[in-house]
C-alpha cells in the first residue's frame, strides 16, 4: 500500500493538521477509557518533537450538525492530552474559518469536527477550508477510514500534502500482513450475534482462510445448517441456506468451518442463569445456547496453536456472564500462547482481551470496529484510497 508516511516528512515550523480517532467515552467531564488517546499520542508526540505547529481534531459522540453541546465537546480529551504532555493544551471552538495562531512545538485541539456544517456530507467547501489551515494533513483515524467525510477524505484531496500517521500506518501494515501476505494456516474467528451483519465478511473470508471459526449467535445458524436442533437460541432461519453454502464452498477447497460438538445452554438470558453442558445434537426445544463446550473449545485451541495467522473479531459466547465465558477464555488463552501472528479488532473482542488480561500478548490490536470489518471484506477504505492517490 503506497501512501506518504508522516515519519518521512520534514515538519519543522509546518502547520500540521491531524485527524485522529479520539472518540472516547466521557462521564462527568472525565475520559473513562483512554485507549484511543494513548494510541494517537505517537503521531502527536512525533509532530511536536519535530517543531511543527500541531492541530488535532476528532469526532466525539453523535452531535447534531451546527449545534455545540458540552457532552460532545473535546474539552475532556484536551485535558487528558495536557496531562500527558505536562503543559496546557488549548481547545479552539470555532476553527473552520481560521483566525487562530499556533506556535512551533505547540499543540491545539480543534473542537469536535462533526459539529461543523458539511463534515458528514464531505462538502467540498468545508474540506477546502480545513485544507487551507495546514501545510500537511495527517490521517491517523483508522476507525473512521471507511467513511468519506470532510475531515477524513475531503481535506486529503486539497491539503498541500496528505499522509498517513504512525497509528494508521501500523494498522494498515498489520492488516496487510494478516490478509494479503499471511503465514498459513490462516484462521479467522468471527463472532457476534447476527450472521446478517457479518455476512459479507464471512463470504469474503470463506474464499481466503483455511479455517473459519464462527461463534456467538452466528454459530447457531451454522449449527442448524448442520442439522442440529438449537432450541430457542438466537438464529436467523432465513440465512441457514447461506450458512450451508458457505460450508460446502469451504469443504470443496479442503478448508473448514468447525462446528461445535458440545454446547453450554441455559433457559433464559440472565447473569444468574445456571449453565448446563450438552452434546450439540441433544439440545432441548426450550434451551438457549450461550457458549461452546470444552470439547469444542479444545478443538479451536488446537487450530489456533497450529495456525500461522489468526484474525479475531468477536467472542464465541456470552462472556460477560462468567458461566458462559469459558469458550471465549480458552480462545483468548490460545491466542496469547500461539506462535502465530495474531490480529484482533472490534469492541467486544477488545473487552474480552481486557477481561482475560492478554492485551500485551496479541501481535496487533486494531482500535477500529467498522473499518476493521470492511478491510476484512476486502473493501477499499475511502480515506486510505485518497492517500494512495495523493502519493502518486
From Swiss-Prot:
Q: Name one GO biological process term.
A: gluconeogenesis
The residues listed in the UniProt record as binding ATP, with positions renumbered to this chain, are 198, 320, 346-349
Q: Which family is this sequence assigned to? A: Belongs to the phosphoglycerate kinase family.
Q: Subunit arrangement?
A: Monomer.
User: Does the record bear Metal-binding in its keywords?
Assistant: no
| Protein's name according to its UniProt entry | Phosphoglycerate kinase
Q: Which Gene Ontology molecular-function terms are recorded? A: ADP binding; ATP binding; phosphoglycerate kinase activity
Residues noted as binding substrate in the record, renumbered to the chain: 21-23, 36, 59-62, 114, 147
Q: Which organism encodes this protein?
A: Nitrosomonas europaea (strain ATCC 19718 / CIP 103999 / KCTC 2705 / NBRC 14298)
Cross-referenced InterPro entries, in alphabetical order?
A: Phosphoglycerate_kinase, Phosphoglycerate_kinase_CS, Phosphoglycerate_kinase_N, Phosphoglycerate_kinase_sf
Q: Which gene encodes it?
A: pgk
What's its catalytic activity?
Answer: (2R)-3-phosphoglycerate + ATP = (2R)-3-phospho-glyceroyl phosphate + ADP
Q: Which UniProt keywords apply?
A: ATP-binding, Cytoplasm, Glycolysis, Kinase, Nucleotide-binding, Transferase
**Listed PANTHER family:** PHOSPHOGLYCERATE KINASE (PTHR11406), PHOSPHOGLYCERATE KINASE 1, CHLOROPLASTIC-RELATED (PTHR11406:SF23)
Biological or metabolic pathway of the protein:
Carbohydrate degradation; glycolysis; pyruvate from D-glyceraldehyde 3-phosphate: step 2/5
What top-tier enzyme class does this entry carry?
Answer: transferase
Amino acid at each position: 500500500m503506497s501512501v506518504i508516511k508522516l515519519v518521512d516528512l520534514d515538519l519543522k515550523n509546518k502547520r500540521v493538521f491531524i485527524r485522529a480517532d479520539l472518540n472516547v467515552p466521557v462521564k462527568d467531564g472525565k475520559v473513562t477509557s483512554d485507549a484511543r488517546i494513548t494510541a494517537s499520542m505517537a503521531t502527536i508526540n512525533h509532530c511536536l518533537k519535530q517543531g511543527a505547529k500541531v492541530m488535532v481534531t476528532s469526532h466525539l459522540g453523535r452531535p447534531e450538525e451546527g449545534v455545540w453541546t458540552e457532552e460532545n465537546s473535546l474539552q475532556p480529551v484536551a485535558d487528558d492530552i495536557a496531562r500527558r504532555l505536562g503543559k496546557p493544551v488549548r481547545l479552539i471552538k470555532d476553527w473552520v474559518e481560521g483566525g487562530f495562531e499556533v506556535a512551533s512545538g505547540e499543540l491545539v485541539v480543534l473542537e469536535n469536527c462533526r459539529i461543523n456544517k458539511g463534515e458528514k456530507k464531505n462538502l467540498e467547501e468545508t474540506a477546502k477550508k480545513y485544507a487551507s489551515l495546514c501545510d500537511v494533513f495527517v490521517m491517523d483515524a483508522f476507525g473512521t477510514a471507511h467513511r468519506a467525510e470532510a475531515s477524513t477524505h475531503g481535506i486529503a484531496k486539497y491539503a498541500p500534502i496528505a499522509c498517513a500517521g504512525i497509528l494508521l500506518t501500523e494498522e494498515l501494515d498489520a492488516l496487510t500482513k494478516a490478509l494479503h501476505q499471511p503465514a498459513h494456516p490462516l484462521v479467522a474467528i468471527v463472532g457476534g450475534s447476527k450472521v446478517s451483519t457479518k455476512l459479507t465478511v464471512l463470504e469474503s473470508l470463506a474464499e481466503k482462510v483455511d479455517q473459519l471459526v464462527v461463534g456467538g449467535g452466528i454459530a447457531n445458524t451454522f449449527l442448524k445448517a448442520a442439522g442440529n436442533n438449537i432450541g430457542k437460541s438466537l438464529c436467523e432461519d432465513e440465512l441457514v441456506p447461506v450458512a450451508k453454502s458457505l460450508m460446502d464452498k469451504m469443504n470443496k477447497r479442503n478448508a473448514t468451518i468447525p462446528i461445535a460438538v458440545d454446547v453450554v445452554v441455559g433457559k433464559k438470558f440472565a447473569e444468574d442463569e445456571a449453565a448446563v453442558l450438552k452434546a450439540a445434537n441433544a439440545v432441548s426445544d426450550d434451551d438457549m445456547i450461550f457458549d461452546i463446550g470444552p470439547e469444542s473449545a479444545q478443538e479451536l485451541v488446537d487450530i489456533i496453536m497450529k495456525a500461522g495467522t489468526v484474525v479475531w473479531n468477536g467472542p464465541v459466547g456470552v462472556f460477560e456472564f462468567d458461566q458462559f465465558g469459558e469458550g471465549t477464555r480458552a480462545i483468548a488463552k490460545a491466542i496469547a500462547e500461539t506462535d502465530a501472528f495474531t490480529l484482533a479488532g472490534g469492541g467486544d473482542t477488545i473487552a474480552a482481551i481486557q477481561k482475560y488480561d492478554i492485551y500485551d500478548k496479541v501481535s496487533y490490536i486494531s482500535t477500529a470496529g467498522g473499518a476493521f470489518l470492511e478491510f476484512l471484506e476486502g473493501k477499499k477504505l475511502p480515506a486510505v484510497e485518497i492517500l494512495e492517490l495523493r502519493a502518486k
